[in-house]
């Protein structure tokens, strides 16, 4: 279901060598580092492709609910000035959510498990290389069908991430 580039990247994250992949090619996985979540969200706005003749779904996937809360608030605020329909096409998927919409979804890796999106933007702290964070990156990466952006972030609102 994923492109070769996304599946190979996810297998590398999980330490799975030489798995035979379906030959559906796409855009290479994009890796980038940002100072904070706000800078990452600005970059996401530049790359998101939703609309006619583009993708139907995109996800911004974070490590924790606290990080997803901040990312969702920033993204929604930035989208409001663009004419994007945040009422019907923006979804913050959290543990109390009762519905899912096409468009942009912001969530955590553990709530994204089992879902698929055309574009996925993964935003995790650079410092966190724990086993759980590695598993989270793998889960998030495998949600992408066509394009995957792996973003690492150094700080949240001027405070360094906790590991």
Which ranges hold each PLM region?
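Glycine-rich phosphate-binding "P-loop"
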Residues: 22-46
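Core RecA-like ATPase module of SF1/SF2 helicases and allied nucleic-acid translocases
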Residues: 1-7, 15-17, 23, 38, ...
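A structural preference for long, well-packed, hydrophobic secondary-structure segments
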Residues: 14-16, 30-31
């Amino acid at each position: 279901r994923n492109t070769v580039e996304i599946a190979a990247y996810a297998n590398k994250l999980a330490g799975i060598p030489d798995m035979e992949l379906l030959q559906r090619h796409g855009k290479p996985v994009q890796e980038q580092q940002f100072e904070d979540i706000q800078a990452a969200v600005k970059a996401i706005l530049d790359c998101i492709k939703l609309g006619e003749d583009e993708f139907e779904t995109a996800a911004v996937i974070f490590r924790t609910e606290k990080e997803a809360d901040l990312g969702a608030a920033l993204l929604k605020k930035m989208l409001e000035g663009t004419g994007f329909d945040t009422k019907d096409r923006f979804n913050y998927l959290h543990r109390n959510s009762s519905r899912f919409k096409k468009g942009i979804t912001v969530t955590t890796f553990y709530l994204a498990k089992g879902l698929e999106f055309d574009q996925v933007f993964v935003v995790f702290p650079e410092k966190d290389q724990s086993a759980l964070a590695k598993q989270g990156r793998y889960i998030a990466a495998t949600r992408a069908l066509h394009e995957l952006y792996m973003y690492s972030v150094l700080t949240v609102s001027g405070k360094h991430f906790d590991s």
